């Protein structure tokens, strides 16, 4: 439906080969559109990346869009869909806004992730929109780690892992691990030890100018740094991960002008019964706000 509406409006729709070759897509309207094999070909001359799916789909599309500096618009087909801008039941309205260029672009902070071996040599590099999770390679046993901020040690502990997150990622894995929610307008790096066995295991909110590092203290157990849940970098015993603010943000297509607070309450279904704030009183006095 989305591709057809855009095509009817005279907009060139490009479909990656992997999507077009899907058995369902083979017998659908997707077969009509330009098929490209590489993301760079799809991005050539494009205005934005349209994502239909849940948060996992959005993160994979953001990986492609980030590489070519294109804005991303997410339409939620999943459950919570925190990263999506719009719900699927309003798809037609969202596409009309895209066709009319009635949207704005918001930059979301990213992380640069560098993995170094025990001798200080770089052995891997990547980036994350949500978070990087440092954990045991086989995901069994305890990760023996030391947390470091700006070249100074903070704490050593055994844990299931250490999460280093952006404000955008604070509502994802870091939130499930007990971290706070950071508003996306805030520039900060969030550090959340995951099930740490130590006295000091509280989440930390660190300056975006800082370098956060996690060292693996084991001489025998390998670890891995997993970015956004699907881009792993192996870490040999004794290696470390250094995380800084990314140089390039992800460009987010915004259609909705409502504040993040409303989004948080709606997506997490937070109870706000009994609220009597000034805005609520103003809404009650304005008959146009009813319904």
Curated annotation (Swiss-Prot):
The UniProt record lists the EC number as 2.7.1.23
What chemistry does it catalyse, as a reaction equation? NAD(+) + ATP = ADP + NADP(+) + H(+)
How would you classify this enzyme at the top EC level?
transferase
The main place the protein resides is: cytoplasm
Q: Where in the cell is it found?
A: Cytoplasm
Q: Which cofactor does it need?
A: a divalent metal cation
**Would the keyword Coiled coil be found if you checked this record's keyword annotation?**
no
Q: Does the keyword NADP apply?
A: yes
Q: Which InterPro entries match?
A: ATP-NAD_kinase_N, ATP-NAD_kinase_PpnK-typ_C, NAD/diacylglycerol_kinase_sf, NADK
Which residues bind NAD(+) per the record? Answer: 55-56, 60, 130-131, 160, 171-176
Q: Which GO terms describe its cellular component?
A: cytoplasm
Pfam family membership, one? NAD_kinase_C
* Residues at the active site: 55 (proton acceptor)
**In terms of domain of life, where is this protein from?**
Bacteria
Q: List the disulfide bonds.
A: none
Q: Which residues form a coiled coil?
A: none
Keyword annotations of the record: ATP-binding, Cytoplasm, Kinase, NAD, NADP, Nucleotide-binding, Transferase
Which GO BP annotation is one of this protein's? NADP biosynthetic process
Tell me the GO molecular function terms: ATP binding; metal ion binding; NAD binding; NAD+ kinase activity
Biological function: Involved in the regulation of the intracellular balance of NAD and NADP, and is a key enzyme in the biosynthesis of NADP. Catalyzes specifically the phosphorylation on 2'-hydroxyl of the adenosine moiety of NAD to yield NADP.
Q: Which protein family is named in the record?
A: Belongs to the NAD kinase family.
Q: Which NCBIfam families match?
A: PRK03372.1
Protein name per the record = NAD kinase
**Organism of derivation:** Corynebacterium glutamicum (strain ATCC 13032 / DSM 20300 / JCM 1318 / BCRC 11384 / CCUG 27702 / LMG 3730 / NBRC 12168 / NCIMB 10025 / NRRL B-2784 / 534)
User: Which taxonomic lineage does the organism of this UniProt entry have?
Assistant: Bacteria, Bacillati, Actinomycetota, Actinomycetes, Mycobacteriales
Q: Which gene carries the instructions for this protein?
A: nadK
């Amino acid at each position: 439906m989305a591709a057809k509406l855009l095509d009817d409006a005279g907009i060139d729709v490009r479909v990656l080969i992997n999507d077009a070759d899907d058995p369902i897509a083979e017998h659908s309207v997707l077969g009509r559109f330009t098929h490209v094999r590489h993301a760079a070909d799809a991005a050539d001359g494009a205005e934005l990346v349209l994502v239909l799916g849940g948060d996992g789909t959005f993160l994979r599309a953001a990986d492609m869009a980030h590489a070519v500096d294109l804005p991303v618009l997410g339409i939620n087909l999943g459950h919570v869909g925190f990263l999506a801008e719009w719900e699927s039941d309003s798809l037609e309205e969202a596409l009309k806004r895209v066709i009319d260029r009635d949207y704005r672009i918001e930059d979301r902070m990213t992380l640069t992730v560098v993995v170094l071996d025990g001798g200080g040599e770089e052995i891997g590099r990547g980036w994350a929109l949500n978070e990087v999770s440092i954990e045991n390679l086989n995901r069994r046993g305890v990760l023996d780690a030391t947390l470091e901020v700006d070249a100074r040690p903070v704490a050593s502990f055994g844990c299931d892992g250490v999460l280093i997150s952006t404000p955008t990622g604070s509502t994802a894995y870091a939130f499930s691990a007990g971290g706070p929610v950071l508003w996306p307008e805030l520039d900060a790096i969030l550090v959340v030890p995951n099930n740490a066995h130590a006295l000091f295991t509280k989440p930390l909110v660190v300056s975006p100018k800082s370098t956060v590092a996690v060292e693996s203290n084991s001489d025998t157990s390998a670890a891995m740094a997993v970015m956004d849940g699907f881009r792993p970098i192996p870490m040999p015993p004794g290696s470390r991960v250094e995380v800084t603010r990314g140089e390039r943000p992800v460009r987010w297509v915004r259609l909705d002008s409502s504040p993040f607070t409303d989004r948080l309450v709606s997506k997490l279904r937070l109870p706000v019964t009994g609220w009597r704030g000034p805005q609520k009183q103003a809404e009650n006095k304005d008959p146009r706000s009813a319904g």
